């Protein structure tokens, strides 16, 4: 599970150019 989250964050960073936590990582929940 932790790996999947890391991958999501990675894709999110590449897609938006910003860390997930900066955009409000609540979207992942």
From Swiss-Prot:
GO MF term (any one): oxidoreductase activity
UniProt record, GO biological process: mitochondrial electron transport, cytochrome c to oxygen; mitochondrial respirasome assembly; regulation of oxidative phosphorylation
Basic and acidic residues biased stretches: 1-13
Cellular component, GO, one term: respiratory chain complex IV
InterPro entries, per the entry: COX7a, Cyt_c_oxidase_su7a_sf, Cytc_oxidase_su7a_met
Signal peptide: none
Domain of life: Eukaryota
Compartment list: Mitochondrion inner membrane
Family: Belongs to the cytochrome c oxidase VIIa family.
Complex and partners: Component of the complex IV (CIV, cytochrome c oxidase), a multisubunit enzyme composed of 14 subunits. The complex is composed of a catalytic core of 3 subunits MT-CO1, MT-CO2 and MT-CO3, encoded in the mitochondrial DNA, and 11 supernumerary subunits COX4I1 (or COX4I2), COX5A, COX5B, COX6A2 (or COX6A1), COX6B1 (or COX6B2), COX6C, COX7A1 (or COX7A2), COX7B, COX7C, COX8B and NDUFA4, which are encoded in the nuclear genome.
Protein name: Cytochrome c oxidase subunit 7A1, mitochondrial
Organism lineage string: Eukaryota, Metazoa, Chordata, Craniata, Vertebrata
